[in-house]
Amino acid sequence: GFSAFSCPELVSIAGSLSADAASKLTSFDMPKLKSLSGVNFVKLTSFSDFSIFEPFIKDNQITEPNWIVSGCKYNPTYQDMIDGKYKPAE
């Protein structure tokens, strides 16, 4: 598997960004992404930094029913994201 997922020119994802059982994945690099309405991450056992999703939570593009995270290295709830807990406490 790969540890980084990079889409430098991606601007919009219609729907949710989904990833399942990518055990080595630690980061997403999508600097131009402006549109995203959900996250579905299951069993990303090395992934723990969800700060890339902060703008989509803050402007309500991603709503609670569309925030699905389980079995990852860190599993923030939707409320955790609202509270700014994008990665595990150090």
Residue ranges and their predicted role:
Residues 1-89:
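Concave beta-strand-loop units of leucine-rich repeat
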